[in-house]
Structures are given as structure tokens and as C-alpha cells.
Amino acid sequence: VHYADLVECLPYDDAVYMLKVTGAQLERMLRHILRDEAFQGEHTEFYQFSHGLRMVWSRSEGAFRELTLDGEPLHPDRLYSVAVQKYHYNNLKDFLNISLEEVEQNGKIRVLSTSARDVIEEYLTVNQHLSRTVEGRLVVEP
């Protein structure tokens, strides 16, 4: 990976925040990401889903047929960590259908890094010759 390619892929070098959300809140956030507008060409935000998360979304039912993390269903009351860049943090309600006030009730919000690009650059420097496979983290059914 050339540095210019990295900058092209990550043109906005924001801070990265860690939020704590309940399983019920996380499911609501994911439902918002997968709303009909996301598949109709309207402007929506779409996110990277972490390794271990598996979602099978039925568009016709508007529901998850499967929603697991590390092979286990999300627990509605358990707290999960979610990382977002500053731009998304500043627009939580619009982009993820959760208010900052709701998130703050779950615990202190932390800044993990002041530069998302630096984190990725460091990872790529330390972990060279990476390969990729399609894991099927998100499956969308009609």
C-alpha cells in the first residue's frame, strides 16, 4: 500500500471515539444502517463491521434473521464497545439513530486516537503482506 493510496481511502483524518452501547441500542443502530434508503441509492452512511459480528438481514421482513457476535446472540442489556470517527460521533442521531445523551448514560466516552489514519498506517507498517477473505459478516436477503 502506498501512502497516497491510504490518504485517498481515508481523506478525513478524524479522531476515533469509543462508545459503550447496550445490545438493544446496537441492534437499533444496525437496523438504522440497514434501512431501505441504504439500498435505494439515497445518501446514507455505511460502516465497517468488526470481525466476529455476523448479520443476516431480511429486507422483506425488515428484520435480522441472525445477529451474533463471536457466535453468540447480542444480549439486550450487555454493554458493547463501538468505535466511530469524530464526524460520525458528531452526528450520532442522524447516522446511527442514537443520541449522545443515551450513549453517555452507558459510561464515559473515550478518545482512542486523535488520528484514524495514523492507527491504520501503524497497523499496515507492522502487519505486512496481509491477505483477505470474505467472511460474510453481513448477508442481505431479499
Where are these regions (language model features)?
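Catalytic centers of hydrolytic enzymes
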Residues: V1-P142
